[in-house]
Structure formats: structure tokens, C-alpha cells
């Protein structure tokens, strides 16, 4: 969607203070080293201009001059193409398709559980157990490479690392046999790019 009445010279990101989906976009921006204006959105009282930009009034919303994007995957892939270095997706079609599928699996299998846990209620405990059990079951995938299924950081990491960062805050305690998940997290968390992706609120989610 393009808005001709708006003209911007830098990227503007509308993002919540603590949102796993917004964090994905901030992590991609940090990995690219791209400067941007960050508008922190109170989801209970969003700014009026957000509704003018995005008919769903949702975050994350990215504005690049006259272009407005408001789907997390669309935003992340746009950033990777708009700022090609360092790449966050493989070059060849087969590997790109596999990475996209990994992102879809993380979203559908795990991030939906994060949303359920954060929503609270009776479903939260079941979602917490499902997330814990599924991470344990897939722990070996976290040590197959330095990053998730890749020797280099990718959009899969931008999707997964914000989840791993939140595990303690979500009340998801992993057993020793899933140490590969937390080892993966520590490798990511030590990077300057990850530190730059955090809001002040998100920095408090881990001791």
C-alpha cells in the first residue's frame, strides 16, 4: 500500500514496547545496521496516524517514504531485499524456500503459543506446556549450526531469538536435556545486533 500524501526520508517503525512480532522486525533492522525512527505504540491507546497508515491499526507497521507495510513476514523480507547486506536469506531458491518454511513453522507452532500464554486464562497453562515440550523435542535442531539451521544469521533467527529471549518471562522452564536451546540463545544474545533490537521494557525480561 502506498500513500502519496506522505513523504519520508528515513524508515519509521511503529512497534510495541514488548511484542515478540515487533521484536522480529527490530532484530532484522539491527542485523542490517539500518537507522530508523522508532514510534513506540501503546496498544491500548494507539496514535491516530497509525490508523491512517494501517487499516488494521496493528503493529509492527513499517513506513519507508510512501510505502507502508504491516505484515511481519512481508516487512522482514522487504528489509532483506531493500538492504541486501548482510543477507538474511540464502541466494538459491531451494534454500530460500526451506528458510521460509522454517519461519512459517516457528510462527504457527511456537509464536501462536506465545500469544496464548500472554493472553492468560485457562489456555495459557496448556500453551506453556506445549511450548516447553515442543522445544525439548526439537532441541537438536538448535545445535546443528551456529545459528538456527544456518552458519549465518537469517530471518529464521530474527523469528526465533525473540521467543527464546522471552522464555523465562513466559514461565517456560526448559530441562537440562534442552540446553541446546539456551546455548543457541546465548550465542545470539551476545551479538551487538541483538542488543540493539531490544526496547527498554524487553531488556528487563531476563536477569
Task: Describe the function of each predicted region.
Residues 43-44, 181, 202:
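Conserved beta-strand edge residues that scaffold enzyme active sites
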Residues 91-93, 196-204:
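Short, flexible loop/turn segments with low-complexity composition
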Residues 65, 161, 200:
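Conserved residues at the C-terminal ends of beta-strands
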Residues 39, 72, 177, 198-199:
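Residue-level detector of family-conserved "landmark" positions at structurally sensitive sites
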Residues 106-197:
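GST-like fold's C-terminal all-alpha helical module
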Residues 1-135, 139, 146:
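GST-like domain detector, emphasizing the conserved glutathione-binding G-site
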Residues 2-3, 202-207:
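Non-globular targeting/processing and membrane-anchoring segments
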Amino acid at each position: 500500500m502506498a500513500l502519496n500524501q506522505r513523504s519520508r526520508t528515513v524508515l519509521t517503525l511503529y512497534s510495541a514496547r514488548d511484542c515478540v512480532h515487533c521484536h522480529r522486525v527490530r532484530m532484522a533492522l539491527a542485523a542490517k545496521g539500518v537507522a530508523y525512527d522508532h514510534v513506540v505504540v501503546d496498544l491500548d491507546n494507539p496514535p491516530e496516524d497509525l490508523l491512517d497508515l494501517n487499516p488494521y491499526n496493528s503493529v509492527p507497521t513499517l513506513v519507508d517514504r510512501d510505502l507502508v507495510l504491516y505484515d511481519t513476514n512481508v516487512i522482514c523480507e522487504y528489509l532483506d531485499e531493500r538492504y541486501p547486506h548482510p543477507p538474511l536469506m540464502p541466494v538459491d531458491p531451494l534454500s530460500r524456500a526451506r528458510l521460509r518454511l522454517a519461519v512459517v513453522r516457528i510462527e504457527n507452532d511456537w509464536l501462536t503459543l506465545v500469544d496464548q500464554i500472554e493472553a492468560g486464562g485457562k489456555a495459557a497453562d496448556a500453551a506453556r506446556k506445549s511450548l516447553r515440550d515442543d522445544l525439548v523435542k526439537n532441541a537438536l535442531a538448535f545445535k546443528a549450526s551456529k545459528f538456527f539451521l544456518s552458519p549465518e544469521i537469517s530471518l529464521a533467527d530474527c523469528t526465533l531469538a525473540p521467543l527464546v529471549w522471552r522464555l523465562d518471562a513466559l514461565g517456560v522452564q526448559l530441562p537440562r536435556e534442552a540446553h541446546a536451546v539456551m546455548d543457541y540463545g546465548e550465542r545470539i544474545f551476545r551479538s551487538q545486533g541483538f542488543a540493539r533490537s531490544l526496547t527498554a521494557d524487553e531488556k528487563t525480561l531476563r536477569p
